[in-house]
């Protein structure tokens, strides 16, 4: 039941989960949300054996084709249970599962680097990030080491929220670019109640978002974008203009990050309210 201080801002347009970090994920109709985000999101990652860092397409010089791998659970994860195996479709369409005894060898061969599949994040995980030569970014033409939240495979926060209003605004600013949800890897896509085309979620920072009857999120900050948004995946081409447009018009931010105040079920079509 909405309270008097809440305002309707739209509805849940789509839900996305990424079982393995930096691989293509799966679109869902409904999902449980816990204090660690969408159930089963980024539960697995590949660890670079040579550095001990988390493998991430943020450094495409090493991991460019990670985005060409697709990961889906073999069955839906359940609260309180061990995560089920994940089916991985390799770039050449070979299908393997995480429970195979030779999975590390298969993935290492496909990537050209020695990796270990893990469901246990280090206490202080790190990844490498390549910064392209795009004006407005914090760094340019360099690789940095970035800290991740302790004992997780997330970049910054457990939930990423994006509105279709932001996607529509970016399309207006750069009509030649293919701005699609897949490029930005959100968990929750909100379709606004109005037809406004703007970076409307910027104004949600510091406020509370309610999804359906149960889930409440605290919007903590903007989501800074990286080179991953420019990389080819599926039928999407490489396009540095995607990131350049975000940098020129919204400080390289697309979407917002959130923490979970109250978990529960969220479903496609659920009303979204802002407090």
What does each model-found stretch correspond to?
Residues 1-275:
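Metal-cofactor-dependent catalytic cores
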